[in-house]
Amino acid sequence: MAVPGCNKDNVRAGCRKCGYPGHLTFECRNFLRVDPKRDIVLDVSSTSSEDSDEESEELNKLQALQEKRINEEEEKKKEKSREKIKLKKKRKRSNSSTTEEDSSKQKKQKYQKKEKKKEKKNKSKKGKHHKKEKKKRKKEKRSSPNRSEVTKK
């Protein structure tokens, strides 16, 4: 049957960390998380006012250490990014200085290819134009004897 102390009326939702009803676990202010990466939690509700100074000092030290770590990590990231940028710049400089002759040769080759393409286009246009003119001449030749015959009669 039902347990005598577990009615819905008797059970009140409360904090699982400190046990006080009035707030939920995620709202608990009686516990402080020292390091967000680790599961180190300090119980503030059980400490007395005399010890609070010592704990606040410890908390300050821990927070200072954590800030130092974060700053060091950021500095390392910045240094790595700077080194990468320097390496990229060095690579670009070395490539450009050693391949100046190659780049000029490549430019000449590109220019020559463009010229060849232009010549081919011009030739094909000329050829088409000549064909049209030949057709016109043939038509004129065919039609001109007919005209001459008509004029003769």
Curated annotation (Swiss-Prot):
It comes from the Eukaryota. Residues 44-153 are annotated as: Disordered. The gene is Srek1ip1. Residues 66-84 have a biased composition (Basic and acidic residues). Keywords: Metal-binding, mRNA processing, mRNA splicing, Phosphoprotein, Zinc, Zinc-finger. This is Protein SREK1IP1. The modification Phosphoserine is found at S52, S96, S97. Interacts with SREK1/SFRS12. InterPro entries: Znf_CCHC. It comes from Rattus norvegicus (Rat). PANTHER family: PROTEIN SREK1IP1, SREK1IP1 FAMILY MEMBER. GO terms for molecular function: nucleic acid binding; zinc ion binding. One of its GO terms (biological process) is mRNA processing. A zinc finger (CCHC-type) spans 13-30. Pfam families: zf-CCHC_3. PROSITE patterns: ZF_CCHC (PS50158). Disulfide bonds: none annotated. Residues 85-94, 106-141 have a biased composition (Basic residues). Possible splicing regulator involved in the control of cellular survival.
